Amino acid sequence: TLYYFLFKCLYHFDKDIFMKRNHLIYLKIMDLLKDGAFNRSSEYHTFVFSSLSLKEVQSRYVVLRNFIEKNHNLIFFTDKRSPKVKSIIKNNLTECLFYDKFKKIQLRIKTKSFILRDNTEIRKYWDKVPLESRKSYSTKLAPSSIIDNKNKCNEKEYLSDKNDFSNFCVVENYIREIDFLSLITDTHERMKIIIENNQIKIKELIP
């Protein structure tokens, strides 16, 4: 039809098109992230989270604890006293890097990060944290504290079990943009997916 012809012409002209949530690459990425959140053996269960602190980029590995597909929200846990929390509060434009060395798929994801403040929701996540893992949130010294002679004796001291929840922090990372790169074939495939106001815009890129 004429409409289909015009559609194809527009698509091939600028390789830039608004898509619904049924695009194959988009659906593939959603499946990878969902699997990463609930499958410990997934290559997407851990990722590199980068934030800006004092004009320097700081990167660290974190564990993907949940992925809420409806609002494209990546969740990880941390200690609220950690430097990354301070960085997010000052500048919440962040980036998440995933890579599957077997499937050779890289996801560079630009995010906007927030500290979850809803105590009811925080408690739901806390209840799922294994008892042996909760202890990591109960050190008397904050993460990244320098160990010297003064506080060496406190290095392995912990707060009471009743207080460790106070240091537990849930970080929400809302996806703004995904750079998808597949290196599995001779003709590498790369796409940029922009998510804005619940609309999905896809651009084909040179790998």
Language-model regions: role of each:
Residues 15-16:
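Targeting/processing segments of secretory and organellar proteins
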Residues 19-71, 75, 86-87:
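An N-terminal domain-cap segment
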